[in-house]
Every structure is written in structure tokens, then in C-alpha cells.
């Protein structure tokens, strides 16, 4: 008994150690008098700490729980052990951080990676429910032995010191771990000779790989420190349920406990995440006819299942061996659907088919998710783990070296580095045609297949600039595993795959799928020719949130799910489709109870099922269980990616929902270690990874917006109206309002809104055919469907080129990581070069002609080149492989390749896409089945989008295939073609009124449609005769055209029906009404004005009709007789609202901040809808300062609530939203009068009087200017500033206009006198103020402020563009002009001079300072005799003042003409 009690005492110590006590407590037998701890000084403490860091696996028998000493004092009693540093955006700081945190990789077996992230409480909870199970001592001892195993016997390989040095310390890559195995641990390493045979047959087939044979690596184990104690302990506790269950959970919960080591994550985050491999095991086969049960009320933790490593490790990786199978309990929230192997696999061929939808990368293995076809033709969800994938490395030999030389040098080194027994390699001839200099166009490379799964250093990549005596460049070192798989297996997007030799027993409960298999040989996976895809299970999702003001966090109140279980993408989705199931989950908004009668009222009035929960955690647990049961392939929603998935994930994380991984198909036990702590980009990556397996179809992301270009705010109601042509008036639900907690009708109305939004989201996605189109695009590009759904056009271009060039035997460029890109940027900044990460190309783009501004009343033809840039690439055979370019100077324009050069890869790819689209369009014309016709239309759209976007990869700086010389050549040929087209039109006496990149607008001079078309067809024939592939065609026919500026016009487009009858439709491009910052009222007014101006009415009559219409609008605005929603203004935030430096003066920013404070989700990219309101009469009192426009801006929903008494500001909307855009529309119309326009809108006409007739400072060469000697001073000085004087006695300021009548001053016989205080001005006081005013105007001129002449831009700056007068604003084509020109300054000086000119004062030839209708117009006027008398009496004073002005006029260079420069030619 004493022996047994001693062993039980040891067991208690072991449990105490595992529960948080220091592991040193478990030391065997110790006397009670032994000290628990030692007292040491700081120096000794640091010394011991250094020793502990050198042996970080210091815990005895920790069963892979994950205790590692990282040098940080930790409280082991805490349950949460997922601590990590905060992420930062500074790449430089990350690099330095990595250097400090590099971990020594050891040659452990797979159990060394089995480190759980579960808390102790979770393990004990599972232990209580486990059955007693016998664990063989040998198995336990083997596992323990792996943690204490000694160093391996090292092969004594002599390697070149230079190459070894490069591999061990490469500053440009992650290849940082030491690879030396000769100088191992002195206590455990022994020199051993290794006999190796290297056989290279130069004449052998390239399909044969070279192998280097090595003797097996021997393991030499050290004695366990407490082996005897553990052995004795296990004799008695082998049947202990606690230990058995703990062992089981440690193994099973290892599966995917940490974030994946994806390449993109490696570029962003520290490399100290988990090194775990994927640990999978097949669960026991069960019948398909099982009952689906979801126990929502269960409060117990879900039971877990064990996972073991898939056995199919790559060649040469003997360290990754599978563990034995363990049984597990069934998860109560898991869908109990399991499929037998016999139901899936064809016994004759040992194959089965899977349609793959999505993927994820986990610890150097690839997992595909999709649907497997059963023998009864039904489909179930499936997961396939692919092992044995290899990275293809290409080593380029130095001159005089061969692949054999590289093999003898690099293969032993790679084997040593990655712990491999053998590596496959072979010589292979490859081509290269990209932008790296000094790379031959074709050469013999050493192709090396390096497994992604290696016993050690698996996270290290080979740097491309690695070199030695035998080679000087390496390609393919940083390729990711998904890219390698699809390129090597030639898989083009989602399709049916034939999978042979799959293992149905190696994976168990690793996912939420019905079928789980592993494949050890990637070559056993091949795409099939089957075209019909399986039906998809789609789930539409809508979430309502509430801001918790105490924690400043968004909480979830309601979730609505609508299930569509058989969505076929091979045929159009019916417009009236109804969900197969509809369910709403809701919890009380503010307390623990609902309004009385909610359940009954919801059952009566709301569609579908409504489930009530007491708290948010129970609701989210049920939501995860329903996802598990429904098992959707696609999750549809509005703003899922940017808003609601983020809120959902954070709430499940904060509430510790154990089944959170149901939102994806990968079973997870713990959250990513750094989730919620890093920046938003990393959180977005984590959420995408958690959702892997289920496609996220967000109708409001970049892809959804590209398919709905007519939307402006992309609100759900707007998208519904534009796409489905149905109205939905959204309700603004604010659950902070107590009415939703107290009023059952209000709560029911809020739930109805969520249900409506859920169903609308699905309907919009089906109408825009988002899933169908993105699938076609993905099949063309060969990338992942999820990437296309996210809207990454650059990713599609990259993959289609990767596939095409790889098939043609080319080495493709390596993907540049964020670190290397940032390093290049720093180097360029040090060299004073432009940053390389700028997405804008630094070369000339398309040619844009200066427009013939004004109204064109004749028919105008729009002649457009079909796909100009793709056609240029084909026409002139422009490709990486054909254009000879200077790779040392990328700014040098290359020449067009000769005609005898073979067709390049890129032109051939584009030609294939164009031909396929042409064939599809032919089928469309003859197809009678409407369903097939729709499918053909989608396919031709996908082909068109793919072909037209191919050029973009050449000029996109961050593109993998960026080639600036090729992009320059393409755009240069485009400019040349457009110019030649214009010259051809002018040679035919046709007027080109405008041209832009790939089209020209030609004024035919005809007022008859048939004659205009005849001219267009003749012009088309002449242009097309010049080219082989380039084609121009009539794109549009304008009956009338109003050209405002570059890229800004309005026109009446003529459309012919089947009977040949023409109808006109207004087409607008680039004008104010197309911009979201102008309200619907402004757009309605602008459309009415354009329709009136472009009509067949007389111009004078049309203008009068416009003025009358605007007067009616003014009355309606002032009397508030227009709907509130007509006043809404939309502004998109380009960054977080708190990040705007001048946010106080920006209405959208102020509204966004108030919305965030109220609990709404507002971030960069959000579109803010607001209304400018009128200041209250109480606030508008004389002693109350006027509120700014930003302070008077309110969200639309606030204005629509009548109790708020918010009224739109009539003055603001009439002046800023109506007057400004209408003036710009009419400024080119003859007889337009800006003063008349201002009067029609009730604005102050005096503000616009000086603008009548235009104010161009004499710089517009198109306007006729009268001679300076023929105009009066009133006309000449209409834009000058009045001279203001200040009384030296009372400081009263007043305008001085010479010897004239005034209410503020008088010119007496004694001089100038202030009427307010009767104080006389001395000559010095007068002249000093004159000089001060003159100097202020001179300073304004020399300030050099520039302003864009485009009224829609209006940018004001002092910076001068390197392109001269080009506007600095992105996308603006205006011209920068001086805001205060030399002519204005000269006229200002002349005006001051005229004020003191005695003769002009006598004749009263002065600019009047008052108008007759002014309120301060003087009642008494000076007589002619008194003016003359006063002038003579004050002549001395007047001449003194004039002398000051003359001094500056004499220095003004504008008043002089250099005759010598004009007539210099006559002197020669």
C-alpha cells in the first residue's frame, strides 16, 4: 500500500505541475526540509535565465502542452496563454524583432509539434467525461523519449564555406536558421562517415530525377531525467481516466490550433507562430442514414476528437510519422453525416470525383474543400488534405559550370538544412524573358524538388539572390503551396478533380465536412473534362448590431439566415426564388427579457422561424450550430467582409464560443494567437482563414461594386433598386432606443427589417450573377474562387500568366514580398529616387485631345477602337518574349519587334481569348434556349473582362509581371494610332471635336441621321484598311453634344428600334450629377436643364424656360416642399474619420464621428449620407455665433425624424448644390447670364455681377479682347479691390472712391475727413495707408498661388508640376493658372492711380463704389461745380497720394514693351 500511496503522491505532484505549479516541484522524493526556491542575486538570475533559454524545452513530460521558455516572466496559473506582442505596421521594426526571436529548429519528430492551446479547465472537463482507456507504456515512453531525444549522428560533409555562409546569413530572405550539422552538440554528436553515390547521366531523359543516397540517420536518445519515476508512476495510473483523456485531447486539439504559415502571413507577421503540422485522423465509418441533432441548450463543452498525422509524407521525410488512432466522442453540435468509402470510390479505378471550391494552407500542407459525388449522384461536402507537394527550385549555373556541379554542391547542403534523406533533382532546359538583367533567355538549370514538409527549417525559404561558385541565381524559392499545386497539376479554377489512391482512414474529425481524406501523391489529382458543376448550398446572412458604450464594442442583437439549398450556376437563377428555410435569432437588446408577447407576435407576423435567447453567447452558439447543420458552400451578405464578419468574429472571440470554426469548414479548437491584437489587415486575414471552405459572397465589396456601377453609396436599398428595379425604404434601427426593449411592435418591426435585408441581399447577388460570373473569371485565370470574389483583378492576371508561361517552358518571376518591397523603397529613398511602391505608372498614358468646348448641334459620331490595348499587343506582337529592351534602363522606350519574329506568349493568349469570345457570341446569335443564352452571355463577359485587363499587369508597379518598357510601348502605339486617326479625319474635312485614349468624336456637319451613318461607315473602312487586327467601329451617334471639358460632356444618344424609329436618351459623363457629393435634387435639376438645352427649342427660349424652372425649384426649396431624401449627400471616407487633419470643417467627417459615437460601424471606405440643415432660430440669435456647415450636417435618418425639427438649409442647397452645377452646364451656352441665374435662385446678384461675361484675366486666347485704350475705367477696374482707409482717430474703416459722395467720408476744403468723428487725415496718414495696401497686393502676386481652371476641381496650391501647367489633382485635366496674375496687379495699381488723378476726378471717370440699389447709396450727391472746386483745393494732397502709386507703377514691367526684342530681326 505504501508503494501505491507513494505513486499516487507522485501523480498528485504531476497534476499540480500541469495545473500551474513550477515543474521543478516534480522532482521525485524530497524531504520536507528542502527549500522550495533559491534566493539569488540579479546577476545569477540572468545567468540562469540564459541557460533556460538555451534549453527552452525544459518541462519534463509536458505531453506537448506547449510550455516553452521565451525569457518572459509568465503567470502559469492563468488560463489564457495566448500572449504575443502587438503588431506594428513598421516593416523595419518587424525585421529587427525577428532577429531577436529566431528559434533554433530541432530534429524532433512530429510529436514535438503537438502543442495544445487548450486551457487546463477544458482538459479537465473532457477528462471527467472520458472512459477509462489503457495506454501502452511503450507508446507513452516513446512520446516522452521524443522530447528528450539526443542529437542525430551527423554526416561529416565538407561544404564550401562561402555557400554555407550565404545560406546561414542571407540579409534578403528568411533563410536564417543555421544549417550546420557537423558542429552539433558536443555531448551527443559523433562523427560518422557517409557513403554517397551521385549518378548523373547527361544523355538520360529529363524525366529521370537524380537521387543522392545516404545512410539512414541514427537517433541516439539520452536518458530521461526522471525515467524511473515516470515508469513506476505509469504502472499504477495506466487506467487513469484523467491521464488517458488528457493524452487524447492533447493530440486531437493540436489540429490547426495556430494560424497557417501562408506566404502572405509570413510577409506581414512575425515568424514565431506555431510550427505545428496538420494532425489528422479518419473517424469511424457510420451509416449515411443518421439523425441530425443539434443540442442548442447543452451547456457542456463539445467533446473533442483525436487527430494524427497523415502518413503520406514527401519522399525523404522519415521524421514525419503518423501516430496511432484514438477513439473520440461525437460532438453534440456536429452534423452526424458520414460517408463510407464504398459510397464514393470507384472500386475498379480506386478514384472518386470532387468539385473543389476553396482551399487553405496549413503548416506546409494544402487542404481543398469542395463537394464529392456519391454513387447515387448526390453530393456531400468534402475535405482533401494533399501531402507530398514540392517547391520547384531552378538553380542557374555560372559560366563554365554545369547542373552536375550545382548538384554536387547544393544537394548535400539542402539535405543538411532541411533534414532530408534524399532530394529529387534533374537538369532541365528552361527559358526566361522577364525583367531581371544578366539572366540568359534560355539555359540549362538544375531543377530541384524541395518538399514543403520537412523535418526541420520548414519555414525557411531560399533567397533568390543566393549564389556560390557554381550558380548565381535561384528561382522559385518563395512560391506558395497553392500556386505550386495548381501550376504543376494544371488546374484552372474550380472544377471536377479525379482523385486516386486517397486514404479514408488517416483523417478524423478534422473539419466540418462529411468526407475527409488525405492524398500522399499530388500527381494522383487530375482535372476532368466534366462541365456540369454540382448545385451549391447558399446561405444569406444579415446581422443587426448594438454599440455597448461601456466597453466601446459592437454587440450582436439579431441574426437572420435564409438557406437556398440547390442553387445551380449552370442555369439562370429564377427571379422569384424563395429560400428553403428562414430563421431569425434574437436576444434582448438591453436587458435579459423581451417585450411581452414578442414570441406570439413574431410567430404571427414574421416569416420563417424566430428563436429567442436570453443572452448573446447562447444566440451565437446556436448560430454556429445551425451553420454546422446547414453546411453552406457560399455565405451571401451585404458588407460582410468589411463590417459584419469582423463584428461576428470578435464577438465569438470575446464570448469564447467553442464552435466558432463553424463559419468555415476547417475545425479549429483555438483562435489564432494574435487575433484581435494586430492591425486590421491581419485581422482580416485571420477571419478569411477561419472562413476558409465557405465562399464569402459580399455584394458590396470591390467585385460587387464593379458589377453595379450605377450605384453611388452601395447601400442595400440602392443596390436593390438599381439591380432589381424594386423599392425598399430602409428603417434605421437603433437598439439603444428603449422602445425596442419596451414596445413589442417596435421590436417586431426591427426583426422584419433584418429579415428583409437578408432576403434582399440574396436576390441582389442572384440578379447581378455574381457567383456565375466570378466562377467563369476564375476558370479563365486559374486562381482561387475566393480571390475572385474578393475583387482582386491583379491576382487573376497574375495566375493566367503563370499558367500560360509555365505551360510554354518559361521560368516565371518570383513574387516580391512586402519586406523586399519595403527594402527597395528605403534604398530608393536613400538614392532620392521615386518610391517603388507607388501604384501609378511613371510614363505617359493614353492621348486625350483638347475638346472643342460648347454646344454642337450637328450629328456627332463616336468612333471607338475595339479593345485597343489588347489589339495593339496582338497587332505589333508585343510580349516579354519578343521585345528587345534595355533591362538596365527601364525608362528607355523599346522598338516594335520585327514582323518575322514568332508570335509571343502574351499575343497568343489574347488571341485565344478573343477567338473564344467570338465563338461564344456566334453561339449566342443562334441559341434559342434562353437559359443557355444567358450562360453564353456571362461567358463572353468574362472573356472580355479578362482580355481587357491583361494590359494592366504590365503597368502596375506591384504586379509580378510588371514591365514598364512594354507598357510604355503599348501606350505609345496607342497615342500614335489615335493621332493618325485624327489626321485621317481632318484630311476628309471632318472636325474632330474630342478624342480620348481609344475613341474620337467626329462632327459630321450633318443634321440627318442617315447621312451621318454613311460618313461613319466610310471613315471606318479607311481606318480598318490600315491595320491587320485593329478595328474601329461606330460606338455611338449623338444628335447633340455639349462638351464641357476633358472627360466631361452631355449628349443625346440616338437609338434605333426594330422598325428603324429613332429615340434619344440623355448620356452624361463626368459632370457634377455623376458625382455622389451632389444630392438627388441637384441631379434632377441638372437633368432637366440638359434636356431643355439639348432640345430643338430656340436657345433664347430654352434659357428662359430654365430660368422659370429654377424659380419654381427655389420656391419649393424655401417652403420645404421637397422630399427629405432628395437632399441627401454621399461622401466616401478614404481613411478613418479621426485621421483627417481638417476634419472639423468636413461635414462627412463630423457626421461619421457622431455615427460612430452612436454605435454605428464607420471606417475607411464607408459612404456617409448626410443633409446640411438650417440653423435653429434660437441658435441664430444675434449673440450666438453662426454654426459652420460641418456643424449643421446631420445623418439622413436624424433629419427624417420629425421630432428632431431639422430642416434642410435652403441657402446652402440653392447656392452650392443647384447654382454651382447649373452655372457650369450653361457657361458655354450663348446668351447665358450668370446674374439672371442667381436672381432666379434668389441669391445675391451682386456677388456674381463681376463674373458676368466670364473672368479669364485675359488668358483665354479663344475670347476676343478689346484694346485697352477703348474700354472705360468702369470696365477695366470691374475686378479690382476697393481702397479701404482706416480713420486714425476712431479706427472706422471705409471704402475710398475719390472725390465722390459717401456716407463715411467727405473731401472738404481742408482735406480728407472722417464723417464718424470729423477727424482730418494728414498727408502722411493717407500715403502710408496707400502704400500698405499696394504692398499687400504685391505680396499676394509674389505668393504665386495657382488655381485649376476646371471649375469642378478648383484646387489651389503653390506647388508647380513638373509638367508645367498640368493640374496636380489626380484625374483632373485642367490647366493651372495664377490666382492673382500680373495683369490683375497692374490693373489694381492703375485703379489706385485713378483715385488720385485730378482730371478723372473732375470728369468723374471713376469706378463707382456704390450701385444705385445699394442700401448705403448716398442720398446727397456732389454737384459738378463743387467737385471741380474740391479737386483744385486738394490738388496737392491728391498729387501726393498719386506719387506713391506712380513710384510702384514705374517699377512694374507690364507697362513697358521691349521694342528691341520685337524688331531685333530688322537690325541684322
From Swiss-Prot:
**What residue spans carry the Basic and acidic residues bias annotation?**
1-12, 71-80, 183-205
Q: Which of the residues bear the PTM Phosphoserine?
A: 31, 82-84, 169-170, 240, 274
- Stored Gene3D superfamilies: 2.40.50.730, 3.30.70.2820, DNA Polymerase alpha, zinc finger, DNA polymerase family B, C-terminal domain, Palm domain of DNA polymerase, Ribonuclease H-like superfamily/Ribonuclease H
Motif CysB motif: residue span? 1348-1372
Where Zn(2+) 2 is bound, by residue? 1348, 1353, 1367, 1372
* Reactions catalysed: DNA(n) + a 2'-deoxyribonucleoside 5'-triphosphate = DNA(n+1) + diphosphate
> Which positions does UniProt annotate for Zn(2+) 1 binding?
1287, 1290, 1314, 1317
This protein's record includes keyword Phosphoprotein: yes
Q: Which GO terms describe its molecular function?
A: 4 iron, 4 sulfur cluster binding; chromatin binding; DNA replication origin binding; DNA-directed DNA polymerase activity; H3-H4 histone complex chaperone activity; nucleotide binding; single-stranded DNA binding; zinc ion binding
Any idea what job this protein has? Catalytic component of DNA polymerase alpha, which in complex with DNA primase (DNA polymerase alpha:primase) constitutes a replicative polymerase. POL1 has a role in promoting telomere replication during interaction with CDC13.
Instruction: Write out the domain note.
Output: The CysA-type zinc finger is required for PCNA-binding.
Q: What else is known?
A: In eukaryotes there are five DNA polymerases: alpha, beta, gamma, delta, and epsilon which are responsible for different reactions of DNA synthesis.
Under which name does UniProt file this protein?
DNA polymerase alpha catalytic subunit A
Q: Can you name the source organism?
A: Saccharomyces cerevisiae (strain ATCC 204508 / S288c) (Baker's yeast)
Amino acid at each position: 500500500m505504501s508503494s501505491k500511496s507513494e505513486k499516487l503522491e507522485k501523480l498528485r505532484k504531476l497534476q499540480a505541475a500541469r495545473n500551474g505549479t513550477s515543474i521543478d516541484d516534480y522532482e521525485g522524493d524530497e524531504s520536507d526540509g528542502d527549500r522550495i526556491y533559491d534566493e539569488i542575486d540579479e546577476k545569477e538570475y540572468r545567468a540562469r535565465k540564459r541557460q533556460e533559454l538555451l534549453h527552452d524545452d525544459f518541462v519534463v513530460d509536458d505531453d506537448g502542452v506547449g510550455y516553452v521558455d521565451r525569457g518572459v516572466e509568465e503567470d502559469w496559473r492563468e488560463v489564457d496563454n495566448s500572449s504575443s506582442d502587438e503588431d506594428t505596421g513598421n516593416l523595419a521594426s518587424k525585421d529587427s524583432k525577428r532577429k531577436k526571436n529566431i528559434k533554433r529548429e530541432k530534429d524532433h519528430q512530429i510529436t514535438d509539434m503537438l502543442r495544445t492551446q487548450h486551457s487546463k479547465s477544458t482538459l479537465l472537463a473532457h477528462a471527467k467525461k472520458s472512459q477509462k482507456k489503457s495506454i501502452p507504456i511503450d507508446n507513452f515512453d516513446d512520446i516522452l523519449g521524443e522530447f528528450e531525444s539526443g542529437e542525430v549522428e551527423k554526416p561529416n560533409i565538407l561544404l564550401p564555406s562561402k555557400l554555407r555562409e550565404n545560406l546561414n546569413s542571407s540579409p534578403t530572405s528568411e533563410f536564417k536558421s543555421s544549417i550546420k550539422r557537423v558542429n552539433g552538440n558536443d555531448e551527443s554528436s559523433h562523427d560518422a562517415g557517409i557513403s554517397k553515390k551521385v549518378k548523373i547521366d547527361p544523355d538520360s531523359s529529363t524525366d529521370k530525377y537524380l537521387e543522392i543516397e545516404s545512410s539512414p540517420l541514427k537517433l541516439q536518445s539520452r536518458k530521461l531525467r526522471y525515467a524511473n519515476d515516470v515508469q513506476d508512476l505509469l504502472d499504477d495510473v495506466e487506467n487513469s481516466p484523467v491521464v488517458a483523456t488528457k493524452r487524447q485531447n492533447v493530440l486531437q486539439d493540436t489540429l490547426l490550433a495556430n494560424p497557417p504559415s501562408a506566404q502572405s502571413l509570413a510577409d506581414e507577421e512575425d515568424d514565431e507562430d506555431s510550427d505545428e503540422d496538420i494532425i489528422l485522423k479518419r473517424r469511424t465509418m457510420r451509416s449515411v442514414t443518421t439523425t441530425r441533432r443539434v443540442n442548442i441548450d447543452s451547456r457542456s463543452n463539445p467533446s473533442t476528437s483525436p487527430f494524427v498525422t497523415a502518413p503520406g509524407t514527401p519522399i525523404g521525410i522519415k521524421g514525419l510519422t503518423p501516430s496511432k488512432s484514438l477513439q473520440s466522442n461525437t460532438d453534440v453540435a456536429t452534423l452526424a453525416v458520414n460517408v463510407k468509402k464504398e459510397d464514393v470510390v470507384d472500386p475498379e479505378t480506386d478514384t472518386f470525383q470532387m468539385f473543389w471550391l476553396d482551399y487553405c494552407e496549413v503548416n506546409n500542407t494544402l487542404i481543398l474543400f469542395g463537394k464529392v459525388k456519391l454513387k447515387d449522384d448526390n453530393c456531400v461536402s468534402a475535405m482533401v488534405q494533399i501531402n507530398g507537394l514540392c517547391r520547384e527550385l531552378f538553380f542557374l549555373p555560372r559560366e563554365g559550370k554545369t547542373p552536375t556541379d550545382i548538384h554536387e554542391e547544393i544537394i548535400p547542403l539542402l539535405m543538411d538544412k532541411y533534414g532530408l534523406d534524399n532530394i529529387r533533382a534533374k537538369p532541365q532546359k528552361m527559358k526566361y524573358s522577364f525583367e531581371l538583367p544578366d539572366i540568359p533567355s534560355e539555359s540549362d538549370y538544375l531543377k530541384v524538388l524541395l518538399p514543403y514538409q520537412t523535418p526541420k527549417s520548414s519555414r525557411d525559404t531560399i533567397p533568390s539572390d543566393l549564389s556560390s561558385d557554381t550558380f548565381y541565381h535561384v528561382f522559385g524559392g518563395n512560391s506558395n503551396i497553392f500556386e505550386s499545386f495548381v501550376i504543376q497539376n494544371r488546374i484552372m479554377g474550380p472544377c471536377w478533380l479525379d482523385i486516386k489512391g486517397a486514404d479514408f482512414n488517416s483523417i478524423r474529425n478534422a473539419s466540418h465536412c462529411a468526407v475527409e481524406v488525405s492524398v500522399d501523391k499530388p500527381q494522383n489529382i487530375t482535372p476532368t473534362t466534366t462541365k456540369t458543376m454540382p448545385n451549391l448550398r447558399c446561405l444569406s446572412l444579415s446581422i443587426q448590431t448594438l454599440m455597448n458604450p461601456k466597453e466601446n464594442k459592437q454587440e450582436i442583437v439579431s441574426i437572420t439566415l435564409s438557406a437556398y439549398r440547390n442553387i445551380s450556376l449552370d442555369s439562370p437563377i429564377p427571379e422569384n426564388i424563395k429560400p428553403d428555410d428562414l430563421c431569425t435569432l434574437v436576444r434582448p437588446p438591453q436587458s435579459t427579457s423581451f417585450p411581452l408577447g414578442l414570441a406570439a407576435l413574431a410567430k404571427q407576423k414574421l416569416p420563417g422561424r424566430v428563436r429567442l435567447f436570453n443572452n448573446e453567447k447562447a444566440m451565437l452558439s446556436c448560430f454556429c450550430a445551425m451553420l454546422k447543420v446547414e453546411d453552406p458552400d457560399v455565405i451571401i451578405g451585404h458588407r460582410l467582409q468589411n463590417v459584419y464578419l469582423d463584428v461576428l468574429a470578435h464577438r465569438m472571440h470575446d464570448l469564447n464560443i467553442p464552435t466558432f470554426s463553424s463559419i468555415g469548414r476547417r475545425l479549429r479548437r483555438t483562435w489564432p494567437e494574435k487575433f484581435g491584437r494586430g492591425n486590421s489587415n491581419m485581422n482580416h486575414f485571420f477571419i478569411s482563414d477561419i472562413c476558409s471552405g465557405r465562399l464569402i459572397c459580399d455584394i458590396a465589396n470591390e467585385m460587387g461594386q464593379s458589377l453595379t456601377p450605377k450605384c453611388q453609396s452601395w447601400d442595400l436599398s440602392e443596390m436593390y433598386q438599381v439591380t432589381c428595379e424594386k423599392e425598399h425604404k430602409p428603417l434605421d434601427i437603433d437598439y439603444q432606443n428603449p422602445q425596442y426593449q419596451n414596445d413589442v411592435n417596435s421590436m417586431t418591426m426591427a426583426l422584419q427589417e433584418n429579415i428583409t435585408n437578408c432576403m434582399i441581399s440574396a436576390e441582389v447577388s442572384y440578379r447581378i450573377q455574381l457567383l456565375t460570373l466570378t466562377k467563369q473569371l476564375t476558370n479563365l485565370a486559374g486562381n482561387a474562387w475566393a480571390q475572385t470574389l474578393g475583387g482582386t483583378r491583379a491576382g487573376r492576371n497574375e495566375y493566367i500568366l503563370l499558367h500560360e508561361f509555365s505551360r510554354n517552358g518559361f521560368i516565371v518571376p518570383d513574387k516580391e514580398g512586402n519586406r523586399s518591397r519595403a527594402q527597395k523603397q528605403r534604398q530608393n529613398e536613400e538614392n532620392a529616387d521615386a518610391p517603388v511602391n507607388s501604384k501609378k505608372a511613371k510614363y505617359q498614358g493614353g492621348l486625350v485631345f483638347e475638346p472643342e468646348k460648347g454646344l454642337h448641334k450637328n450629328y456627332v459620331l463616336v468612333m471607338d477602337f475595339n479593345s485597343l490595348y489588347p489589339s495593339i499587343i496582338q497587332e505589333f506582337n508585343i510580349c516579354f518574349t519578343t521585345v528587345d529592351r534595355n533591362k538596365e534602363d527601364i525608362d528607355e522606350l523599346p522598338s516594335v519587334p520585327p514582323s518575322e519574329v514568332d508570335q509571343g506568349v502574351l499575343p497568343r493568349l489574347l488571341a485565344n481569348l478573343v477567338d473564344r469570345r467570338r465563338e461564344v457570341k456566334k453561339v449566342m446569335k443562334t441559341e434559342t434556349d434562353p437559359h443557355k443564352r444567358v450562360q453564353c452571355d456571362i461567358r463572353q463577359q468574362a472573356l472580355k473582362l479578362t482580355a481587357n485587363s491583361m494590359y494592366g499587369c504590365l503597368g502596375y508597379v506591384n504586379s509580378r509581371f510588371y514591365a514598364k518598357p512594354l507598357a510604355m510601348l503599348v501606350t505609345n502605339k496607342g497615342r500614335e494610332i489615335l493621332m493618325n486617326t485624327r489626321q485621317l479625319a481632318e484630311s476628309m474635312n471632318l472636325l474632330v471635336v474630342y478624342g480620348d485614349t481609344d475613341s474620337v468624336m467626329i462632327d459630321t456637319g450633318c443634321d440627318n441621321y442617315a447621312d451621318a451613318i454613311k460618313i461613319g461607315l466610310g471613315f471606318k473602312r479607311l481606318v480598318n484598311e490600315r491595320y491587320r487586327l485593329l478595328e474601329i467601329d461606330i460606338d455611338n451617334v449623338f444628335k447633340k453634344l455639349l462638351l464641357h471639358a476633358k472627360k466631361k460632356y452631355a449628349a443625346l444618344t440616338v437609338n434605333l428600334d426594330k422598325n428603324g424609329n429613332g429615340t434619344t436618351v440623355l448620356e452624361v459623363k463626368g459632370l457634377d450629377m455623376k458625382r455622389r457629393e451632389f444630392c438627388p435634387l441637384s441631379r434632377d435639376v441638372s437633368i432637366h436643364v440638359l434636356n431643355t438645352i439639348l432640345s430643338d427649342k430656340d436657345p433664347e427660349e430654352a434659357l428662359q424656360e430654365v430660368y422659370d424652372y429654377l424659380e419654381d425649384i427655389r420656391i419649393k426649396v424655401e417652403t420645404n416642399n421637397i422630399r427629405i431624401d432628395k437632399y441627401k449627400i454621399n461622401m466616401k471616407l478614404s481613411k478613418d474619420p479621426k485621421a483627417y487633419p481638417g476634419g472639423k470643417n468636413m461635414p462627412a467627417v463630423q457626421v461619421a464621428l457622431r455615427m460612430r459615437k452612436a454605435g454605428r460601424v464607420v471606417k475607411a471606405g464607408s459612404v456617409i449620407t448626410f443633409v446640411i440643415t438650417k440653423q435653429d432660430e434660437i441658435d441664430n440669435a444675434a449673440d450666438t455665433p453662426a454654426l459652420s456647415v460641418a456643424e449643421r450636417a446631420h445623418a439622413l435618418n436624424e433629419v427624417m425624424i420629425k421630432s428632431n425639427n431639422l430642416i434642410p438649409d435652403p441657402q446652402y442647397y440653392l447656392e452650392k448644390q443647384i447654382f454651382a452645377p447649373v452655372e457650369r452646364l450653361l457657361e458655354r451656352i450663348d446668351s447665358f447670364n450668370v446674374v439672371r441665374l442667381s436672381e432666379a435662385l434668389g441669391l445675391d446678384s451682386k456677388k456674381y455681377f463681376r463674373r458676368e461675361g466670364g473672368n479669364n484675366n485675359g488668358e483665354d486666347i479663344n475670347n476676343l479682347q478689346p484694346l485697352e485704350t477703348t474700354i472705360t475705367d468702369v470696365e477695366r477696374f470691374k475686378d479690382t479691390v476697393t481702397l479701404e482707409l482706416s480713420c486714425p482717430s476712431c479706427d472706422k474703416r471705409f471704402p475710398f472712391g475719390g472725390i465722390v459722395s459717401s456716407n463715411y467720408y467727405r473731401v472738404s476744403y481742408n482735406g480728407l475727413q472722417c464723417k464718424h468723428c470729423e477727424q482730418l487725415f494728414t498727408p502722411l496718414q493717407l500715403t502710408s495707408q496707400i502704400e500698405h495696401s499696394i504692398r499687400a497686393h504685391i505680396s499676394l502676386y509674389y505668393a504665386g498661388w495657382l488655381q485649376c481652371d476646371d471649375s469642378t476641381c478648383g484646387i489651389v496650391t503653390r506647388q508647380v508640376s513638373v509638367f508645367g501647367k498640368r493640374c496636380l489633382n489626380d484625374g483632373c485635366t485642367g490647366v493651372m493658372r495664377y490666382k492673382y496674375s500680373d495683369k490683375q496687379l497692374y490693373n489694381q495699381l492703375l485703379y489706385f492711380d485713378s483715385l488720385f488723378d485730378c482730371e478723372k476726378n473732375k470728369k468723374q471717370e471713376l469706378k463707382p463704389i456704390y450701385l444705385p440699389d445699394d442700401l448705403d447709396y448716398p442720398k446727397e450727391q456732389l454737384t459738378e461745380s463743387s467737385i471741380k472746386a474740391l479737386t483744385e483745393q486738394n490738388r496737392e494732397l491728391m498729387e501726393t497720394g498719386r506719387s506713391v502709386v506712380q513710384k510702384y507703377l514705374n517699377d512694374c514691367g507690364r507697362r513697358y514693351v521691349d521694342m528691341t526684342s520685337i524688331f531685333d530681326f530688322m537690325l541684322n
